[in-house]
Amino acid sequence: MSLNPRDAVIVDFGRTPMGRSKGGMHRNTRAETMSAHLISKVLERNAKIDPAEVEDVIWGCVNQTLEQGWNIARMASLMTQIPHTSAGQTVSRLCGSSMSALHTAVQAIQTGNGDVFVVGGVEHMGHVGMMHGVDPNPHLSLYAAKASGMMGLTAEMLGKMHGISREAQDAFGERSHRLAHKATVEGKFKDEIIPMQGYDENGFLKVFDYDETIRPETTLESLATLKPAFNPKGGTVTAGTSSQITDGASCMIVMSAQRAQDLGIQPMAVVRAMAVAGVDPAIMGYGPVPSTQKALKRAGLTMADIDFVELNEAFAAQALPVLKDLKLLDKMEEKVNLHGGAIALGHPFGCSGARISGTLLNVMKQNGGTLGVSTMCVGLGQGITTVFERV
């Protein structure tokens, strides 16, 4: 395929192993240290790229305080081989932060405002809890449902509206762990996981090159025993069908097609379209439907044209209505989250957008796909989507 000089292409992707937030592998590693290690290793394996060419490090992070404060993009960049002459900015679109980081870089490239960008994101949810320092305006309840800030209750609402049964949610949760374990055993994650030192459950330092969050022993029977996590009386959403609270980072190198060609670099994919959309915060998990419809329209495509999809699994009760309305339920086994998702791998907020996008590109490469969509819901009622074409 032919590319325009100002097309934005992805030339590499890497991520940390996903660690449990409670006593997990990253418990003694700071968020900016994790980010810097990842950025450094991804740049090291792309020797044709001079770090001095990096225009901007654009890093997603939601709770920007404590070790994640004071512009963690710049903090991490200063700890890498990227020179001080390159810039850094931290962005937040809650769950969609690192996908927004990608979109920001793509827009800069398309408009001639840079040729080489490092994008991604991090969230150390073990060190900086999701609600640490958060003080929502009490007047917000005059404009949106009071429970809109309680993600589990929005999932309960969406699941109830779409008639999603507890059994269907449990089956989706079991699938996530089963497929993630299968991908691990078959080495499907080896190109994306950047090994990192961490501590095992006994406190011994070791190198991790796998996700410690996956539970291969998960069964429908074990999931059926779990109690509702958010609505004790009549709820259907459990811890086993919710994204895990984890620690991790993800990183992409994004370039103009012209600069990649000049350096003799074969891109993984080109970004064909992007979109964001808003929905009622009470059903925040529905956001991927309008954002994906908008992105596909901009690309001149329909969902039937798409080979593979990565949908962030915030909750099974949220993912299943999205798949239903995107006409993907009957195609799920052949198209959607073939290596599992956030129920098994976790959802470190600032990390996930680039993580699912990079995993998508590897799924496309491993299975011969040409067109792919990565999409996710965003807290308080948004969706964000990227359409990729493999080159």
UniProtKB/Swiss-Prot annotation:
Single annotated GO MF: acetyl-CoA C-acyltransferase activity
Keyword Transferase: yes
Matching CDD domains: thiolase
Keywords assigned: Acyltransferase, Cytoplasm, Fatty acid metabolism, Lipid degradation, Lipid metabolism, Transferase
Protein family according to the UniProt entry: Belongs to the thiolase-like superfamily. Thiolase family.
Function: Catalyzes the final step of fatty acid oxidation in which acetyl-CoA is released and the CoA ester of a fatty acid two carbons shorter is formed.
Protein's name in the database: 3-ketoacyl-CoA thiolase
Taxonomic classification: Bacteria, Pseudomonadati, Pseudomonadota, Gammaproteobacteria, Pseudomonadales
Annotated gene: fadA
